[in-house]
Amino acid sequence: PLSNSPKAKIKKQLFQPLTIIEVSIDVRHNASLHKITDARIAQPFTSIPFNPYKLSISIFIADFLNQALMREQADKPLFAYIQNSIEWLDNCDEGFANFHLVFMMRLSMFLGFYPNTDNYHAGSCFDLRSACFSGVVPMHNDYLKPAEASIVSLILRMSFANMHLFRLSRTERNRLIDIILHYYRLHLPSFGEMKSLEI
């Protein structure tokens, strides 16, 4: 059983979803596993663990990152994006219902398959394989018809600062999660099934 001592409480905090920690590791070149000698929270959360909606988003994002970054190497700009995004979510008070949608689409910039919006116009389809909008229906089934393509173009105009201005229903939001996850699976063959519950 877990102790209620201050030390044990700190240890439990280390395992909250998306917690950013600093670790000291005893690296031994002849060992396949290295020993963690010290671990501490780099920046404690002020709201994520205590807000049920933010906590559900963080669980979903942690699961998503586990799939999306499975084969990634060290990447400082990518880490900075993730860290800054988590800090934004922790610090914001309202208007974060679309956070996960914006986060997932922006992450694709760092992974090399952010959608090309140059050819978007009303009535365009969105080709999920080639990551671009087109007035011509592709010769495969991995595309979105104009109605859904227009919602994707909407997400691509969102940022954390302005996303509160865009109103989406729960049904639209859940459909967009499905579309984005399918999009990632097309571009990252190692992307597996998400274990977290739907937001």
Residue map of PLM features:
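Non-catalytic alpha-helical scaffolds and adjoining flexible linkers that form interface surfaces
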Residues: P1-I199
